[in-house]
Regions:
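Mid/C-terminal beta-alpha module of Rossmann-like enzyme folds, strongest
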Residues: 2, 203-258
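N-terminal Rossmann NAD(P)H-binding glycine-rich loop of SDR-like oxidoreductase domains
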Residues: 3-23
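Conserved Rossmann-fold NAD(P)-dependent oxidoreductase catalytic core, especially the SDR/UDP-sugar
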Residues: 28, 88-133
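NAD(P)H-binding glycine-rich loop region in Rossmannoid oxidoreductase-like domains
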Residues: 29-94, 98
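Conserved beta-loop-beta element that borders a ligand/cofactor-binding pocket
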Residues: 140-163
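Alpha-helical substrate-binding/gating segment
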Residues: 173-182, 190-224
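Conserved C-terminal active-site "lid" loop/helix of NAD(P)H-dependent oxidoreductases
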Residues: 252-280
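Amphipathic terminal alpha-helices
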Residues: 284-297
Length: 297
């Protein structure tokens, strides 16, 4: 199958490309820059130049493939306008999905467990409503297209980690270094799910190959961690001696986007993906990666 992957040189996108090609699929990778295009060409990946700010460029990529896996996310600076960011994302998704109507082609959207809001202490399954305005419009658009001849699928990742990278984990490290200790919000009792990079790449491929239209899948490894415990492990890995720092809930803006991620509980069930797709996440745990793996100091 020929798959158009947006964000093909990003953290998750690059792992998906590697998994797809390893399984015999052909990838058309979207590149925003000459640098990204060169990275794809070095790996033998066909390049399609495009970007979120130019929806028509993404439509052209979608038309050239049998399936689309959308992982691209806008680049964010310190003065980012989130309303404009959201508009750009929803416009690009809508354009691609509309171009696929009546084709029975596959469109896989990267959403996120953050769409559930605060899950509390119980792991939620995919029947839980998506309420966050950052996630709901795109999910509604993509899922609604199932009735119009699009094989729509949604993946809802939690915190992705591995290989000493990850936007979320590295932001957590950077904030902790700035604050002089592993950062958590409030009492640090918010709960979180997470998933190793190779495992989420495998999930995307299995969804591409096996899923029925109109299905969503949570992406995690089944473990549940307190954010304070993770913050302490990050402190050790960052050479901060295990010291931790609490940011009060009413000052969560000091933590930037990472504060919104770790300030409330986001725990999910993965039984559906395991049952329907025969998916079995098997990578090292986040705590192992922090203590002795790719993030260890």
């Amino acid at each position: 199958m020929k798959v158009f992957v947006t964000g093909a040189t990003g953290y998750v996108g690059a792992a998906i490309v590697k998994n797809l090609t390893g399984a015999g699929h052909t990838v058309l990778g979207m590149a925003r820059s000459d640098e990204s295009a060169a990275k794809l060409q070095e790996r033998g990946i066909e390049v399609h130049r495009g970007e979120l700010a130019d929806p028509e460029s993404m439509v052209e990529g979608a038309k050239r493939a049998d399936a689309v896996i959308h992982t691209a996310f806008p680049q964010m600076g310190p003065d980012v306008n989130f309303d404009e960011l959201l508009r750009m994302m929803t416009t690009a998704v809508a354009a691609m999905v509309d171009s696929l109507k009546g084709t029975d082609k596959t469109f896989i959207l990267t959403s996120g467990a953050g769409g559930y809001g605060d899950t509390g202490t119980t792991a939620v399954d995919e029947s839980m409503p998506i309420v966050a305005p950052t996630h709901a419009p795109n999910e509604q658009k993509v899922m609604g297209a199932t009735a119009d001849g699009v094989r729509s699928i949604v993946i809802r990742p939690t915190i992705i980690y591995g290989y000493g990278a990850s936007n979320t984990i590295m932001a957590w490290f950077n904030l902790s270094r700035q604050m002089g200790g592993g950062v958590y919000i409030g009492e640090g009792d918010a709960l979180m799910s997470s998933l190793y990079l190779d495992d989420i790449a495998e999930l995307y491929r299995l969804a591409l190959e096996k899923s029925e239209p109109g299905e969503a899948y949570n992406a995690a490894d089944g473990s549940i961690l307190e954010t304070k415990v993770v913050a302490e492990a990050i402190s050790h890995a960052a050479g901060l001696g295990g010291k931790t720092v609490s940011i009060p809930h009413d000052e969560v803006q000091k933590a930037g986007f990472i504060g919104r991620i770790i300030g409330t509980s986001k725990v999910v069930s993965i039984e559906k993906a395991k049952r329907v797709l025969s998916w079995n996440p098997s990578g090292p745990s986040l705590m192992d990666e922090l203590s002795t793996g790719s993030y260890a100091s």
